[in-house]
Amino acid sequence: LHLCDRRQRQMCIRDRSKCRIVSYKSTLFFINELYYVGEDIMMKMSNFRWKVAWLIFIVSFVSYMDRVNLSVATPVIMKEYGFDKIDMGLIQSFFFAGYALMQVPGGMMAEKFGHRITGSLAVIWWSVFTALTAVAKGKFSFAAVRFLFGMGEGPIYPAFAIAIFRWFNKKEKGNASSFLLNGSFLGPVIGPALTVVLMSTVGWKMVFLIFGIVGILMAWVWHKYVPENPAESPYVNEAELAHINEGRTDVPIVKKAAPWGKLFTSVQFWAIGVQYFITDYIMFVFLAWLPLYLMEAHGFSLAKMGIWAAMPWLTLIIITFSSGYFCDKAIAKGASQYWIRTLCGSAGIIICSLALYIATRTADPMQNVMWLSLSLGSLGLTFNASWACAINLGGEFAGSISGWMNFWGNIGGVIAPTLTAWIATSYGWDAALIATALSGVVGVLAWFLVRPDKAIV
């Protein structure tokens, strides 16, 4: 064996694909982050980090399945317990209150104790209270259970942000973030139809028990396969570890608290929170009320709603995945992080608001679903830009930055169900959707204060 010369090493750093070429005479591989050439020796990058990305996708999917099942069961629960829209809006808001409350503490927990422990405990906690939703009897017990369920889900996304920071090359963070987001968005795609099928066969209460059991199983998988440091994983070889650590300065795996004094004086810190407040506010209007809206405003049956309510979320998945891929490609080729992330983030909200307004002017049910799909789907541009920016701005403090951002997003979630219910009850569904569309103006303005190319800390 002999060390690569400087030219060979620089070639390998510039074009990682060259390191994967299999040759018996001159095969490049990695040992302790050095590049060697040897005869009859082959090493290919293991790419286990993308299996971790798919696991993040699945856990995110389960988390949103656990949220959307209440929205789908809302008509049945309202009838069984005599609740009205405002009652259900308040119950939904209690979930988001608990969820928002744990965002910043969840980020601090993920940084202090690591994404493995924090993520596992969060999934177990929320799964227990998902199951306990089945035993709630009145609006106060429903509200209490959903509040505690929200507290359990609170730390998971900050934990995922830390995992992405530790497990992925800095040029892959946008694409990795799209796995996190699209797992969340797949829940409302499959959730309505699956929940309707389960409700029709075993009743709405068993739906919550089944999802609770699935969540506990996922907590075990996360704890087993995603250690704090990729170097501790038996599935990550030296080639992949060197790729993950390329251009990275060493940071401790378990670390001290974020510099909150510096963060609170940063305009970017507040701007990324404000734009995400608007982004999540709009999304949670869809999450909380889309099923009932389609049934009341456009006469969809329960079975038909279970199918068509998935279309906006499916569109969101497609746009989020594609935007994450193409934005990362553009940045890797030298495009400005500021323009790529900022333009995508603001354009997503603009298109969303315009399409949502057009949906209110459309009487045909299928055209309405089409415009709603474009509206929610365009937020894929914004979601992807938001999480990539949070990770870039925070670096080793990505858990705290993403927790702060998600905290404001879920303040939007606290307000959206109840405010939308009140407007819809008082003035009709069209007024509720127009008010939602108008909120986008604030989000667009906030985006132009975010500079993803300039880290806060």
Task: Describe every region a protein language model picked out.
Residues L1-D15:
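Single conserved hydrophobic/aromatic residue that forms the stacking wall/gate
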Residues K51-K85, F286-P291:
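Extracytoplasmic
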Residues L70-S71, S266-F321, F383, W387:
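Extracytoplasmic gate region of multi-pass secondary transporters
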Residues G82, G114, V135-S141, N169, ...:
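Helix-breaking motifs and short loop linkers at transmembrane-helix boundaries and internal kinks
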Residues M102-K137:
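Conserved MFS/SLC helix-loop-helix module at the cytosolic interface between two early adjacent transmembrane helices
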Residues I117-A131, W339-L356:
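Structural signature of the two symmetry-related core transmembrane helices
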Residues V145-S184:
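Cytoplasmic helix-loop-helix junction between adjacent transmembrane helices
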Residues S184-V226, P230-S233:
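Helix-loop-helix hairpin linking two adjacent transmembrane segments in secondary transporters
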